């Protein structure tokens, strides 16, 4: 998803387009990895001095509820990234930097075959580890 797509989702749901929301979405599009709310707040504070953590957090949860961003828990903390909408895939997530890599493999059919009497509504596969760049920096 890009910023314009996200703004379209906001408008389709009767929500206001604001420069703050656009700038927050731009951060996700530009960085393209999982980010915590504090990082977003610090980035936003450069252009909007004094922006509250509550304002950032409310918008993050609004974006998540609308499917604009995705979330995961990493090291006991919620992290967010722009939603991937181009095709079904899963992610490798670096535990150090939050960088993500696409995994174009989905085990859901195998899982369904092992659970024939259940109705699976949705699924999410995340693989965690240390990316090549962080490994290189550690050595």
UniProtKB/Swiss-Prot annotation:
Keywords, ordered alphabetically: Cytoplasm, DNA-binding, Iron, Metal-binding, Repressor, Transcription, Transcription regulation, Zinc
UniProt-annotated location(s): Cytoplasm
GO biological process: negative regulation of DNA-templated transcription; regulation of secondary metabolite biosynthetic process
Membrane-spanning ranges: none
GO cellular-component term (any): cytoplasm
Positions of Fe cation binding: 88, 90, 109, 123
Spans annotated as Dimerization: 86-139
Region DNA-binding: start-end pairs: 1-85
Keyword Transcription: yes
Pfam family, one: FUR
Record carries keyword Zinc: yes
Annotated residues for binding of Zn(2+): 94, 97
Molecular-function annotations in GO: DNA-binding transcription factor activity; transcription cis-regulatory region binding; zinc ion binding
Family: Belongs to the Fur family.
Described function: Acts as a global negative controlling element, employing Fe(2+) as a cofactor to bind the operator of the repressed genes.
The protein's assembly and partners: Homodimer.
Identification of the protein by name: Ferric uptake regulation protein
Organism in which the protein naturally occurs: Staphylococcus epidermidis (strain ATCC 35984 / DSM 28319 / BCRC 17069 / CCUG 31568 / BM 3577 / RP62A)
Taxonomic path: Bacteria, Bacillati, Bacillota, Bacilli, Bacillales
Gene behind the chain: fur
């Amino acid at each position: 998803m890009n910023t314009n797509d996200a703004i379209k989702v906001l408008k389709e749901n009767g929500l206001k387009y604001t420069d703050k929301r656009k700038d927050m979405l731009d951060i996700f599009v530009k960085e393209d990895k999982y980010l915590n709310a504090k990082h977003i707040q610090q980035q936003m504070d450069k252009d909007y001095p004094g922006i509250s953590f509550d304002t950032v957090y409310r918008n993050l949860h609004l974006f998540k509820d609308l499917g604009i961003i995705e979330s995961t828990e990493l090291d006991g903390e919620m992290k967010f990234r722009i939603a991937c909408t181009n095709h079904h895939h899963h992610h490798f997530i670096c535990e150090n930097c939050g960088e993500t890599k696409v995994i174009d493999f989905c085990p859901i059919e195998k899982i369904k075959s092992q659970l024939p009497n259940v109705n699976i509504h949705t699924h999410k596969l995340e693989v965690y580890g240390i990316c090549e760049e962080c490994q290189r920096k550690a050595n």
